[in-house]
Amino acid sequence: YVFYVLLVGLSPWVSIPYSDSTALIIPVLMLYLYTNVDTGGFKNVKIACFSFLGVLGYMIKPQTAILFISVFLISMVFIRLRYIKKTVKYLSIFLISILISYFSIGIFMSSNNITVNKELEISYPHFVKMGLNNITDGGYLSDDAGKSMSFRSTKERKEENIVVIKERLKEYGIVGLLKHQIKKTLVTYNDGTFAWSQEGNFYWRVNEEKSKIERFFRNIYYETGSNHSIFKYIVQGAWLTILVMQSLNTFIKRKDMDNNVRVILLSLIGLFIFESIFEARARYLYTYVPIFIISGMIGLNGFMDWMKKR
């Protein structure tokens, strides 16, 4: 709870109505439904709700689908053949719920009277291209963004992105790409504030202070504030502690690891792969902070159990 308060509850990202904070509850809520699917009844409803959250989360923040996929993969790999009939039943509910959720959300979106120009879409190749740039170590690069937006059609944009991707991979080579990946990982994982106040022209407008409370919080959260460095040190320490505790999961023996733990670890591995492929931003981890904290606690408990058995 302390880590959650420090990294999520007190994080200024909570106050930003953007996809990261909006989708914050989805991965942990999906994990809750998965870990409690066999308790308290209503299993079919829980599976349907899980499927709906997976589709909704993907549409808000694609990274949330990683935990969704992890649950599916673990469930399939560790399937019990003696329960094959029930498995087919629940899998059918799962797939049907996905289809219903997808089309229902699609109908809702199409009825909002907002016309979307598909030719202005920035697709996945753009973010792969940006993730390979060596100027910002895989982070946001205005030149890449401007180049992609200069094309009038999605087809032209994708073709240019793919050409640049191939060029950058060729320039790096295997060793160069590995070095780039190390730098990119630091960009993504080495900031407990999750890149607060570090993106573009961060403050569009700063209003005049009207109260002492306002001044108090500005001193904490604004990078020019007198207490901002203290805030950064505290959350950075909390974040690094979680990462260290998460690494302690290596002390958990395979026979002592249940599917719940497997889902958590696989989802975080999947998140790492996702961030390694696409544009690097520390903020993109924010939605998974609750999962990181749970993983850290599991790792700490596993390490303590390992120490007791020595």
Residue spans for each PLM region:
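Membrane-interface anchor segments at the N-terminal boundary of transmembrane helices
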Residues: 187-264, 268
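Membrane-proximal stem/loop segments at transmembrane-domain junctions that anchor or position
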Residues: 110-211
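Membrane-interface alpha helices of multi-pass inner-membrane proteins
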Residues: 46-62, 72-73, 93-98
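Membrane-interface helix-loop-helix junctions at transmembrane boundaries of multi-pass membrane enzymes
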Residues: 39-45, 79-91, 245-265
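Membrane-interface transmembrane helices that cradle and orient dolichyl/undecaprenyl
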Residues: 28-49, 76
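Perimembrane helix-loop-helix junctions
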Residues: 67-99
